[in-house]
Protein backbone atom coordinates (compact mmCIF):
# COMPACT_ATOMS: atom_id res chain seq x y z
CA UNK A 1 0.00 0.00 0.00
CA UNK A 2 3.00 2.34 0.35
CA UNK A 3 3.11 2.59 -3.46
CA UNK A 4 -0.40 4.03 -3.52
CA UNK A 5 -0.37 7.73 -4.63
CA UNK A 6 -1.67 9.09 -1.34
CA UNK A 7 -0.57 12.68 -1.89
CA UNK A 8 -1.97 12.87 -5.42
CA UNK A 9 -5.27 11.54 -4.08
CA UNK A 10 -5.32 14.09 -1.27
CA UNK A 11 -4.49 16.99 -3.62
CA UNK A 12 -6.76 16.04 -6.54
CA UNK A 13 -9.83 14.84 -4.59
CA UNK A 14 -11.21 18.32 -3.68
CA UNK A 15 -11.05 19.82 -7.19
CA UNK A 16 -12.32 16.65 -8.88
CA UNK A 17 -15.11 16.36 -6.31
CA UNK A 18 -15.88 20.04 -6.76
CA UNK A 19 -16.18 19.61 -10.53
CA UNK A 20 -19.06 17.19 -9.97
CA UNK A 21 -21.11 19.92 -8.25
CA UNK A 22 -22.29 20.98 -11.71
CA UNK A 23 -24.36 17.77 -11.83
CA UNK A 24 -26.46 18.80 -8.83
CA UNK A 25 -29.89 20.43 -9.34
CA UNK A 26 -29.86 24.23 -9.37
CA UNK A 27 -32.01 24.56 -6.25
CA UNK A 28 -30.25 21.88 -4.22
CA UNK A 29 -28.39 24.27 -1.90
CA UNK A 30 -28.57 21.98 1.12
CA UNK A 31 -27.41 18.97 -0.91
CA UNK A 32 -24.49 20.93 -2.38
CA UNK A 33 -23.41 22.10 1.08
CA UNK A 34 -23.46 18.63 2.60
CA UNK A 35 -21.67 17.20 -0.42
CA UNK A 36 -18.90 19.81 -0.03
CA UNK A 37 -18.62 19.12 3.72
CA UNK A 38 -18.23 15.41 2.96
CA UNK A 39 -15.50 16.01 0.35
CA UNK A 40 -13.53 18.21 2.78
CA UNK A 41 -14.01 15.82 5.69
CA UNK A 42 -13.01 12.74 3.66
CA UNK A 43 -9.89 14.57 2.48
CA UNK A 44 -9.07 15.56 6.07
CA UNK A 45 -9.47 11.93 7.17
CA UNK A 46 -7.13 10.84 4.35
CA UNK A 47 -4.54 13.40 5.49
CA UNK A 48 -4.83 12.16 9.09
CA UNK A 49 -4.57 8.52 7.95
CA UNK A 50 -1.44 9.20 5.87
CA UNK A 51 0.12 11.10 8.79
CA UNK A 52 -0.62 8.34 11.32
CA UNK A 53 0.26 5.26 9.26
CA UNK A 54 2.67 6.28 6.50
CA UNK A 55 4.82 9.09 7.93
CA UNK A 56 7.92 8.47 10.06
CA UNK A 57 8.37 11.33 12.54
CA UNK A 58 12.08 10.73 13.13
CA UNK A 59 12.99 10.79 9.42
CA UNK A 60 14.00 14.30 8.18
CA UNK A 61 14.04 13.16 4.55
CA UNK A 62 11.23 13.53 2.03
CA UNK A 63 8.62 10.80 2.47
CA UNK A 64 5.64 9.50 0.46
CA UNK A 65 7.41 10.58 -2.72
CA UNK A 66 5.53 10.37 -6.03
CA UNK A 67 7.35 10.88 -9.30
CA UNK A 68 5.41 10.77 -12.58
CA UNK A 69 6.65 12.03 -15.93
CA UNK A 70 4.18 14.68 -17.04
CA UNK A 71 5.53 16.72 -19.97
CA UNK A 72 8.36 14.98 -21.84
CA UNK A 73 9.33 18.05 -23.85
CA UNK A 74 11.19 19.76 -21.00
CA UNK A 75 11.46 17.00 -18.41
CA UNK A 76 8.56 18.18 -16.24
CA UNK A 77 7.43 15.79 -13.49
CA UNK A 78 4.35 15.51 -11.31
CA UNK A 79 6.48 15.21 -8.19
CA UNK A 80 5.06 15.18 -4.66
CA UNK A 81 6.54 14.46 -1.23
CA UNK A 82 6.26 15.70 2.34
CA UNK A 83 8.62 16.24 5.24
CA UNK A 84 8.44 17.76 8.71
CA UNK A 85 8.20 21.28 7.29
CA UNK A 86 5.19 20.64 5.05
CA UNK A 87 3.24 18.26 7.29
CA UNK A 88 2.03 20.92 9.76
CA UNK A 89 0.68 23.30 7.07
CA UNK A 90 -1.03 20.38 5.29
CA UNK A 91 -2.83 19.31 8.49
CA UNK A 92 -3.73 22.97 9.16
CA UNK A 93 -5.09 23.37 5.61
CA UNK A 94 -7.33 20.32 5.88
CA UNK A 95 -8.65 21.33 9.30
CA UNK A 96 -9.32 25.03 8.58
CA UNK A 97 -10.82 24.42 5.12
CA UNK A 98 -13.27 21.87 6.52
CA UNK A 99 -14.41 24.33 9.20
CA UNK A 100 -14.49 27.26 6.74
CA UNK A 101 -16.76 25.26 4.45
CA UNK A 102 -19.06 24.57 7.39
CA UNK A 103 -19.03 28.26 8.33
CA UNK A 104 -20.20 29.20 4.81
CA UNK A 105 -23.66 27.73 5.41
CA UNK A 106 -25.41 31.16 5.21
CA UNK A 107 -24.19 31.58 1.59
CA UNK A 108 -27.08 30.84 -0.78
CA UNK A 109 -26.34 32.96 -3.88
CA UNK A 110 -24.55 30.99 -6.63
CA UNK A 111 -23.76 28.27 -4.11
CA UNK A 112 -22.54 25.82 -6.79
CA UNK A 113 -19.77 28.17 -7.88
CA UNK A 114 -18.98 29.24 -4.32
CA UNK A 115 -18.34 25.72 -3.04
CA UNK A 116 -16.47 24.69 -6.18
CA UNK A 117 -14.11 27.65 -5.71
CA UNK A 118 -13.51 26.69 -2.08
CA UNK A 119 -12.62 23.13 -3.12
CA UNK A 120 -10.38 24.34 -5.97
CA UNK A 121 -8.57 26.64 -3.52
CA UNK A 122 -8.20 23.65 -1.17
CA UNK A 123 -6.45 21.61 -3.88
CA UNK A 124 -4.13 24.48 -4.79
CA UNK A 125 -3.03 25.00 -1.20
CA UNK A 126 -2.44 21.29 -0.54
CA UNK A 127 -0.50 21.05 -3.80
CA UNK A 128 1.71 24.00 -2.86
CA UNK A 129 2.72 22.39 0.44
CA UNK A 130 3.27 18.95 -1.17
CA UNK A 131 5.17 19.88 -4.35
CA UNK A 132 8.73 18.64 -4.81
CA UNK A 133 9.08 20.14 -8.29
CA UNK A 134 9.64 23.89 -8.32
CA UNK A 135 7.54 24.48 -11.46
CA UNK A 136 4.72 22.36 -10.03
CA UNK A 137 5.04 24.50 -6.88
CA UNK A 138 4.44 27.59 -9.05
CA UNK A 139 1.43 26.03 -10.81
CA UNK A 140 -0.19 25.12 -7.49
CA UNK A 141 0.70 28.57 -6.11
CA UNK A 142 -1.17 30.17 -9.00
CA UNK A 143 -4.05 27.67 -8.93
CA UNK A 144 -5.44 29.12 -5.71
CA UNK A 145 -5.25 32.76 -6.88
CA UNK A 146 -8.21 32.61 -9.28
CA UNK A 147 -10.61 31.01 -6.75
CA UNK A 148 -9.64 33.62 -4.14
CA UNK A 149 -10.18 36.46 -6.62
CA UNK A 150 -13.65 35.18 -7.55
CA UNK A 151 -14.60 34.53 -3.92
CA UNK A 152 -13.61 38.11 -3.10
CA UNK A 153 -15.27 39.77 -6.09
CA UNK A 154 -18.59 37.89 -5.96
CA UNK A 155 -19.27 37.42 -2.25
CA UNK A 156 -18.38 40.29 0.04
CA UNK A 157 -19.03 43.90 1.00
CA UNK A 158 -19.77 47.00 -1.06
CA UNK A 159 -16.11 47.52 -2.02
CA UNK A 160 -15.45 43.87 -2.85
CA UNK A 161 -14.47 44.58 -6.48
CA UNK A 162 -11.89 47.13 -5.37
CA UNK A 163 -10.39 44.77 -2.78
CA UNK A 164 -10.42 41.82 -5.22
CA UNK A 165 -8.66 43.91 -7.89
CA UNK A 166 -6.07 45.08 -5.37
CA UNK A 167 -5.51 41.49 -4.26
CA UNK A 168 -4.98 40.16 -7.78
CA UNK A 169 -2.69 43.05 -8.77
CA UNK A 170 -0.45 42.46 -5.76
CA UNK A 171 -0.38 38.66 -5.93
CA UNK A 172 -0.26 38.23 -9.70
CA UNK A 173 2.36 40.98 -9.97
CA UNK A 174 4.54 39.31 -7.35
CA UNK A 175 4.11 35.96 -9.13
CA UNK A 176 6.09 37.38 -12.06
CA UNK A 177 9.13 37.59 -9.74
CA UNK A 178 8.43 34.05 -8.53
CA UNK A 179 8.31 32.69 -12.09
CA UNK A 180 11.47 34.54 -13.15
CA UNK A 181 13.31 33.19 -10.11
CA UNK A 182 12.15 29.64 -10.84
CA UNK A 183 13.18 29.84 -14.50
CA UNK A 184 16.54 31.35 -13.59
CA UNK A 185 17.33 28.65 -11.02
CA UNK A 186 16.17 25.78 -13.22
CA UNK A 187 18.08 26.97 -16.30
CA UNK A 188 21.33 27.68 -14.42
CA UNK A 189 22.81 24.26 -14.95
CA UNK A 190 25.72 22.92 -16.95
CA UNK A 191 23.77 19.94 -18.28
CA UNK A 192 19.98 20.35 -18.52
CA UNK A 193 17.16 22.30 -16.81
CA UNK A 194 16.64 21.22 -13.20
CA UNK A 195 13.21 21.52 -11.57
CA UNK A 196 13.62 18.96 -8.79
CA UNK A 197 13.89 20.47 -5.28
CA UNK A 198 16.48 17.85 -4.26
CA UNK A 199 18.76 18.74 -7.18
CA UNK A 200 18.31 22.47 -6.59
CA UNK A 201 19.29 22.06 -2.93
CA UNK A 202 22.77 20.95 -4.02
CA UNK A 203 23.07 23.61 -6.74
CA UNK A 204 25.52 26.48 -6.12
CA UNK A 205 25.40 29.92 -7.73
CA UNK A 206 27.65 32.98 -7.87
CA UNK A 207 26.86 35.17 -4.86
CA UNK A 208 25.54 38.08 -6.96
CA UNK A 209 23.21 35.79 -8.92
CA UNK A 210 22.01 34.07 -5.75
CA UNK A 211 21.16 37.48 -4.26
CA UNK A 212 19.13 38.35 -7.38
CA UNK A 213 17.22 35.06 -7.14
CA UNK A 214 16.70 35.61 -3.42
CA UNK A 215 15.26 39.10 -3.91
CA UNK A 216 12.82 37.84 -6.55
CA UNK A 217 11.51 35.09 -4.29
CA UNK A 218 11.46 37.45 -1.31
CA UNK A 219 9.16 39.90 -3.13
CA UNK A 220 6.79 37.09 -4.12
CA UNK A 221 6.61 35.62 -0.62
CA UNK A 222 6.58 39.02 1.13
CA UNK A 223 3.28 39.85 -0.59
CA UNK A 224 1.63 36.63 0.61
CA UNK A 225 3.09 36.61 4.14
CA UNK A 226 2.66 39.68 4.19
CA UNK A 227 5.77 41.72 5.00
CA UNK A 228 5.58 45.52 5.13
CA UNK A 229 5.38 47.57 2.94
CA UNK A 230 3.74 44.94 0.67
CA UNK A 231 0.86 44.31 3.09
CA UNK A 232 -1.70 46.94 2.08
CA UNK A 233 -3.91 44.52 0.12
CA UNK A 234 -4.62 42.49 3.26
CA UNK A 235 -6.77 44.89 5.38
CA UNK A 236 -8.93 45.83 2.37
CA UNK A 237 -9.36 42.18 1.40
CA UNK A 238 -10.31 41.06 4.90
CA UNK A 239 -12.57 44.06 5.36
CA UNK A 240 -14.72 43.14 2.35
CA UNK A 241 -14.51 39.32 2.06
CA UNK A 242 -17.10 36.90 3.42
CA UNK A 243 -15.87 35.56 6.74
CA UNK A 244 -15.50 31.99 5.43
CA UNK A 245 -13.07 33.38 2.84
CA UNK A 246 -11.34 35.39 5.59
CA UNK A 247 -10.80 32.13 7.50
CA UNK A 248 -8.99 30.65 4.50
CA UNK A 249 -6.95 33.80 3.92
CA UNK A 250 -5.82 34.25 7.53
CA UNK A 251 -5.56 30.56 8.33
CA UNK A 252 -3.78 29.25 5.23
CA UNK A 253 -2.98 31.74 2.46
CA UNK A 254 -0.71 33.93 4.61
CA UNK A 255 1.16 30.80 5.71
CA UNK A 256 2.01 29.94 2.11
CA UNK A 257 4.30 32.97 1.95
CA UNK A 258 6.09 31.99 5.16
CA UNK A 259 6.39 28.39 3.93
CA UNK A 260 7.95 29.63 0.67
CA UNK A 261 10.50 31.72 2.58
CA UNK A 262 11.68 28.64 4.48
CA UNK A 263 11.36 26.11 1.65
CA UNK A 264 13.06 28.17 -1.08
CA UNK A 265 14.86 31.20 0.39
CA UNK A 266 16.35 29.37 3.37
CA UNK A 267 16.77 25.86 2.01
CA UNK A 268 17.86 26.59 -1.57
CA UNK A 269 19.54 30.01 -1.21
CA UNK A 270 21.29 29.77 2.15
CA UNK A 271 24.21 32.11 1.38
CA UNK A 272 21.92 34.93 0.29
CA UNK A 273 19.68 34.31 3.31
CA UNK A 274 22.69 34.77 5.59
CA UNK A 275 23.21 38.20 4.01
CA UNK A 276 19.56 39.24 4.20
CA UNK A 277 18.64 37.81 7.62
CA UNK A 278 19.57 40.98 9.62
CA UNK A 279 17.28 43.01 7.34
CA UNK A 280 14.51 40.46 7.79
CA UNK A 281 14.84 40.80 11.56
CA UNK A 282 14.70 44.58 11.26
CA UNK A 283 11.59 44.36 9.07
CA UNK A 284 9.97 41.87 11.46
CA UNK A 285 10.58 44.15 14.45
CA UNK A 286 9.18 47.21 12.67
CA UNK A 287 6.21 45.19 11.42
CA UNK A 288 5.22 44.09 14.92
CA UNK A 289 5.02 47.67 16.22
CA UNK A 290 3.71 49.32 13.04
CA UNK A 291 0.82 46.87 12.49
CA UNK A 292 -0.11 46.78 16.19
CA UNK A 293 -0.23 50.59 16.44
CA UNK A 294 -2.14 50.86 13.12
CA UNK A 295 -4.65 48.28 14.35
CA UNK A 296 -5.60 50.60 17.21
CA UNK A 297 -6.82 53.24 14.75
CA UNK A 298 -9.15 50.94 12.78
CA UNK A 299 -12.93 51.35 13.23
CA UNK A 300 -13.78 48.24 11.18
CA UNK A 301 -13.47 45.14 13.39
CA UNK A 302 -12.29 42.92 10.51
CA UNK A 303 -9.60 45.43 9.50
CA UNK A 304 -8.44 45.62 13.10
CA UNK A 305 -8.08 41.83 13.20
CA UNK A 306 -6.32 41.96 9.80
CA UNK A 307 -3.68 44.36 11.11
CA UNK A 308 -3.25 42.16 14.17
CA UNK A 309 -2.48 39.30 11.76
CA UNK A 310 0.20 41.44 10.09
CA UNK A 311 1.68 42.16 13.52
CA UNK A 312 1.76 38.50 14.53
CA UNK A 313 3.38 37.55 11.22
CA UNK A 314 6.23 39.86 12.27
CA UNK A 315 7.22 37.26 14.89
CA UNK A 316 7.31 34.66 12.14
CA UNK A 317 9.68 36.86 10.09
CA UNK A 318 11.88 37.28 13.18
CA UNK A 319 12.10 33.51 13.62
CA UNK A 320 13.03 32.95 9.98
CA UNK A 321 15.66 35.71 10.13
CA UNK A 322 17.22 34.44 13.37
CA UNK A 323 18.90 31.43 11.66
CA UNK A 324 18.71 29.54 14.94
CA UNK A 325 17.14 26.19 15.68
CA UNK A 326 14.99 27.64 18.46
CA UNK A 327 13.89 30.65 16.41
CA UNK A 328 12.96 28.65 13.30
CA UNK A 329 11.03 26.09 15.36
CA UNK A 330 9.18 29.02 16.93
CA UNK A 331 8.38 30.40 13.47
CA UNK A 332 6.95 27.04 12.35
CA UNK A 333 4.90 26.89 15.54
CA UNK A 334 3.65 30.44 14.84
CA UNK A 335 2.51 29.31 11.37
CA UNK A 336 0.26 26.71 12.98
CA UNK A 337 -0.78 28.81 15.97
CA UNK A 338 -1.79 31.92 14.04
CA UNK A 339 -3.53 29.76 11.44
CA UNK A 340 -5.97 28.62 14.12
CA UNK A 341 -6.31 31.91 16.03
CA UNK A 342 -6.64 34.17 12.97
CA UNK A 343 -9.28 31.94 11.37
CA UNK A 344 -11.25 31.79 14.63
CA UNK A 345 -11.28 35.56 15.17
CA UNK A 346 -12.53 36.24 11.64
CA UNK A 347 -15.21 33.57 12.04
CA UNK A 348 -16.47 35.15 15.26
CA UNK A 349 -16.40 38.65 13.75
CA UNK A 350 -18.41 37.29 10.82
CA UNK A 351 -21.02 35.58 13.00
CA UNK A 352 -21.45 38.85 14.90
CA UNK A 353 -21.98 40.65 11.59
CA UNK A 354 -24.63 38.09 10.58
CA UNK A 355 -26.65 39.16 13.63
CA UNK A 356 -26.03 42.91 13.81
CA UNK A 357 -25.15 43.88 10.23
CA UNK A 358 -22.52 46.14 11.79
CA UNK A 359 -18.74 46.17 11.31
CA UNK A 360 -17.76 49.50 12.87
CA UNK A 361 -16.76 49.21 16.50
CA UNK A 362 -18.09 52.63 17.51
CA UNK A 363 -21.60 51.48 16.50
CA UNK A 364 -21.45 48.34 18.66
CA UNK A 365 -21.68 47.71 22.38
CA UNK A 366 -23.60 45.64 24.89
CA UNK A 367 -23.35 42.30 23.07
CA UNK A 368 -22.17 40.39 26.16
CA UNK A 369 -25.64 40.23 27.75
CA UNK A 370 -27.73 38.90 24.83
CA UNK A 371 -24.87 36.79 23.37
CA UNK A 372 -22.94 35.27 26.30
CA UNK A 373 -21.62 32.29 24.31
CA UNK A 374 -20.13 34.45 21.55
CA UNK A 375 -18.75 36.78 24.22
CA UNK A 376 -17.07 33.92 26.11
CA UNK A 377 -15.50 32.33 23.03
CA UNK A 378 -14.43 35.68 21.54
CA UNK A 379 -12.81 36.64 24.85
CA UNK A 380 -10.97 33.32 25.13
CA UNK A 381 -9.59 33.50 21.59
CA UNK A 382 -8.64 37.16 22.05
CA UNK A 383 -6.60 36.03 25.05
CA UNK A 384 -4.92 33.48 22.77
CA UNK A 385 -4.18 36.24 20.26
CA UNK A 386 -2.53 38.44 22.89
CA UNK A 387 -0.31 35.47 23.88
CA UNK A 388 -1.85 34.46 27.20
CA UNK A 389 0.23 31.71 28.89
CA UNK A 390 -1.28 28.30 28.24
CA UNK A 391 -2.29 29.25 24.69
CA UNK A 392 -0.39 28.44 21.49
CA UNK A 393 0.39 32.09 20.69
CA UNK A 394 2.33 32.53 23.92
CA UNK A 395 4.54 29.49 23.31
CA UNK A 396 5.26 30.43 19.68
CA UNK A 397 6.21 34.04 20.40
CA UNK A 398 8.23 33.09 23.48
CA UNK A 399 10.26 30.51 21.54
CA UNK A 400 10.95 33.02 18.74
CA UNK A 401 12.26 35.53 21.30
CA UNK A 402 14.37 32.83 22.97
CA UNK A 403 15.81 31.98 19.56
CA UNK A 404 16.93 35.59 19.15
CA UNK A 405 18.29 35.98 22.69
CA UNK A 406 20.30 32.73 22.63
CA UNK A 407 21.63 33.30 19.09
CA UNK A 408 25.42 33.76 19.09
CA UNK A 409 25.50 35.22 15.56
CA UNK A 410 24.25 38.65 16.67
CA UNK A 411 25.82 41.27 18.92
CA UNK A 412 24.39 41.77 22.40
CA UNK A 413 23.21 45.31 21.59
CA UNK A 414 21.35 43.99 18.51
CA UNK A 415 19.57 41.35 20.56
CA UNK A 416 18.64 43.90 23.24
CA UNK A 417 17.20 46.31 20.66
CA UNK A 418 15.16 43.62 18.88
CA UNK A 419 13.84 42.28 22.19
CA UNK A 420 12.94 45.80 23.35
CA UNK A 421 11.08 46.59 20.12
CA UNK A 422 9.15 43.31 20.15
CA UNK A 423 8.29 43.86 23.81
CA UNK A 424 6.64 47.16 22.86
CA UNK A 425 4.64 45.29 20.22
CA UNK A 426 3.58 42.70 22.80
CA UNK A 427 2.36 45.55 25.03
CA UNK A 428 0.32 47.06 22.17
CA UNK A 429 -1.31 43.71 21.36
CA UNK A 430 -3.47 43.49 24.52
CA UNK A 431 -4.41 47.16 24.09
CA UNK A 432 -6.09 46.63 20.69
CA UNK A 433 -7.39 43.15 21.60
CA UNK A 434 -9.05 44.33 24.81
CA UNK A 435 -10.31 47.43 23.00
CA UNK A 436 -12.23 45.19 20.57
CA UNK A 437 -13.82 43.36 23.50
CA UNK A 438 -14.74 46.59 25.27
CA UNK A 439 -16.29 48.22 22.21
CA UNK A 440 -18.18 45.13 21.03
CA UNK A 441 -19.42 43.52 24.21
CA UNK A 442 -19.55 46.07 27.03
CA UNK A 443 -21.88 49.04 27.52
CA UNK A 444 -25.59 49.26 26.70
CA UNK A 445 -25.73 50.73 23.19
CA UNK A 446 -27.13 47.66 21.40
CA UNK A 447 -28.73 46.01 24.40
CA UNK A 448 -31.25 48.85 24.60
CA UNK A 449 -32.04 48.65 20.86
CA UNK A 450 -34.68 46.11 19.77
CA UNK A 451 -33.10 43.89 17.12
CA UNK A 452 -34.40 40.65 15.65
CA UNK A 453 -30.86 39.35 15.04
CA UNK A 454 -30.03 39.20 18.74
CA UNK A 455 -29.61 35.46 19.25
CA UNK A 456 -26.63 33.58 20.59
CA UNK A 457 -24.42 30.93 18.98
CA UNK A 458 -26.14 27.89 17.57
CA UNK A 459 -24.72 24.33 17.51
CA UNK A 460 -22.87 24.88 14.20
CA UNK A 461 -21.07 27.99 15.43
CA UNK A 462 -20.25 26.45 18.80
CA UNK A 463 -18.84 23.37 17.07
CA UNK A 464 -16.57 25.45 14.80
CA UNK A 465 -15.38 27.68 17.65
CA UNK A 466 -14.64 24.83 20.05
CA UNK A 467 -12.98 22.78 17.27
CA UNK A 468 -10.47 25.61 16.80
CA UNK A 469 -10.12 26.39 20.51
CA UNK A 470 -9.12 22.81 21.40
CA UNK A 471 -5.89 22.75 19.29
CA UNK A 472 -5.03 26.31 20.41
CA UNK A 473 -5.06 25.19 24.05
CA UNK A 474 -3.53 21.77 23.28
CA UNK A 475 -0.54 23.27 21.44
CA UNK A 476 -0.13 25.84 24.22
CA UNK A 477 0.11 23.06 26.79
CA UNK A 478 2.05 20.54 24.68
CA UNK A 479 3.94 22.24 21.79
CA UNK A 480 6.22 19.20 21.44
CA UNK A 481 3.57 17.67 19.17
CA UNK A 482 4.49 20.23 16.49
CA UNK A 483 8.22 19.99 17.23
CA UNK A 484 8.09 16.19 16.93
CA UNK A 485 7.80 16.43 13.17
CA UNK A 486 9.54 19.79 12.51
CA UNK A 487 12.69 19.62 14.69
CA UNK A 488 14.68 17.19 12.51
CA UNK A 489 13.86 19.12 9.34
CA UNK A 490 14.82 22.42 10.99
CA UNK A 491 18.17 20.91 11.98
CA UNK A 492 18.73 19.73 8.39
CA UNK A 493 17.93 23.20 6.97
CA UNK A 494 20.22 24.99 9.44
CA UNK A 495 23.11 22.62 8.65
CA UNK A 496 23.51 24.67 5.43
CA UNK A 497 24.41 27.74 7.53
CA UNK A 498 27.27 26.22 9.54
Swiss-Prot record:
One of its GO terms (molecular function) is NADH dehydrogenase (ubiquinone) activity. HAMAP family: NDH1_NuoM. It is a multi-pass membrane protein. One of its GO terms (cellular component) is chloroplast thylakoid membrane. Its EC number is 7.1.1.-. It comes from Phaseolus vulgaris (Kidney bean). NCBIfam families: NDH_I_M. The chain crosses the membrane at residues 4-24, 37-57, 80-100, 112-129, 134-154, 167-187, 208-228, 242-262, 272-292, 305-325, 330-350, 386-406, 416-436, 463-483. One of its GO terms (biological process) is ATP synthesis coupled electron transport. It is found in: Plastid, Chloroplast thylakoid membrane. Signal peptide: none annotated. This is NAD(P)H-quinone oxidoreductase chain 4, chloroplastic. It is an enzyme of class 7 (translocase). Keywords: Chloroplast, Membrane, NAD, NADP, Plastid, Plastoquinone, Quinone, Thylakoid, Translocase, Transmembrane, Transmembrane helix. InterPro entries: NADH_Q_OxRdtase_chain4, NADH_Q_OxRdtase_chainM/4, NADH_UbQ_OxRdtase, ND/Mrp_TM. The keyword Transmembrane helix applies. Belongs to the complex I subunit 4 family. It catalyses: a plastoquinone + NADH + (n+1) H(+)(in) = a plastoquinol + NAD(+) + n H(+)(out); a plastoquinone + NADPH + (n+1) H(+)(in) = a plastoquinol + NADP(+) + n H(+)(out).
